[in-house]
Structures are given as structure tokens and as C-alpha cells.
């Protein structure tokens, strides 16, 4: 098994605490509402949202795969950090054991925030992660972030 690490950052005009509430803590409800072209539903399979919780994320028709199951690994409300692993569905299967993801939202001096994202692809055997997988993951994250950001800008009273 190999582990391939991919790190990226994304900026937002939304303050870190507000973005954490919307994007991380309420993303299950917000994503299908603001980005139905990317996520059709999120179902809580097991747990209360904290570590160990299992969620099934379903994708719209025409998407490369029907669903993924995520396991919540950490929710740090103080440091705006969230870790989860994709454990089933989507790209996980013959070549990938799991994908571990960590998102940390950091406040910026201008009142916005930076999302620091670390993805670890745990491969089976000597398989390598394809550039298309990383690109698709980054595009999905960017789509969700911009949709949530637009929603928050249009609804200034939400998630304060």
C-alpha cells in the first residue's frame, strides 16, 4: 500500500467561523440545496455527526459514480478543523483503500479565510493515483466552496 499526499488551498471572503459553521457543520444540509449539480443528497447512516459518524453522499444522475460513504474522523470546533475519510464508493475500490481528507479553515487579516486541504490517497498494492482523480476532487471542493460562499453572501443573516 502506498500513500499519496496532495495539498491545496482555497481562499474565501467569508470569515473562518461562519464558513466553518456553514461548509463543515451544516454542509450535509447546505450542499444539496446550493449545489444540486454536485451533490443530490447526504444521508446520516450512523452516528451523531462527531467522530465515527458514517454518511452516504449521493451524486446526481450522469455523475461518474453514484455515491461515496464518508467516515468522520475529527471535528475541532476551536481550530476550525475537520477530518474525514472516504471509505466506500466512488473512487474507492479496486485501486484505492480510502482517501483521508483534512480541512482547516484559517482566518485572514482581511476578514476572510483560507481553507487548507490535505488529501491522502491510500492505494492498494502498487497502484498510483491518477491526475484526473486529484483534479476531480479539487474541482468538486471548489464547486461546493463557491456555492456555499455565494449563499452566505446572499444571506448575510445565515450562520452567524
UniProtKB/Swiss-Prot annotation:
Xref: SUPFAM superfamilies: Bet v1-like
Gene3D superfamilies linked to this entry: 3.30.530.20
CDD domains: Bet_v1-like
UniProt cross-references to SMART domains, sorted A to Z: Bet_v_1
Residues annotated to bind brassinolide: 55, 82, 84, 101
An annotated GO cellular component: cytoplasm
Protein name per its UniProtKB record: Major pollen allergen Bet v 1-J
